[in-house]
Amino acid sequence: MKTKLPHIDADLIRTALALISVNDDPRMLTKVVHINNQYIEATNGHALIRMKHNAEFDQDVAVQFVYSVPDEAEFLDINSHDDGSHTVTYYRQDRDEEFRPFEKSELVLMQEHYPDLTPLLTKTFKEGKTPILVSRYLALPYLMFGIGSVDVLPSEDSRSVLFAMDALTSEMYGEPILIAMAMEKDIHKLSQSLRDQIMVG
């Protein structure tokens, strides 16, 4: 069993925020990162991510990051205060392996209960014909994890896909489960029909 980290790896939060940034959904749910004692989760309404953080963290909060994570941040802590407010403290690890706090910023707490994403995350995915996806979601693995390899596995009902990352990426990002919703099967026919109407007009 891995030794737990004293703080949350900032790269995991950056990854969750990268998913949220691909978003045109106004709901608060699609603007927050959910963190509990085991996982970091986020959704933009059409795709979702769950990662193990392996940190000493015993809260269960869904918070909106008002400002982006500083480039030099290596780790972070979520702080809850007596007045109900929440802040994030960023750390960098110095040569003596001490964690040095260097910046703090506000967070916005989601008041509603964060939904249980487990039913979506525990679907069965297998090799097969990949359903049609919104093109920008094909870029998610690169936007979130950088260079690596990925397999796209459809769910049994072909309504979603799992982006199965390579072993190194999986180790670095807490065994990420990244799922995106598929589009309707006849979307290409609709697109062709719209194109024909435009060309005739």
PLM regions and their residue ranges:
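DNA polymerase processivity clamps
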Residues: 1-201
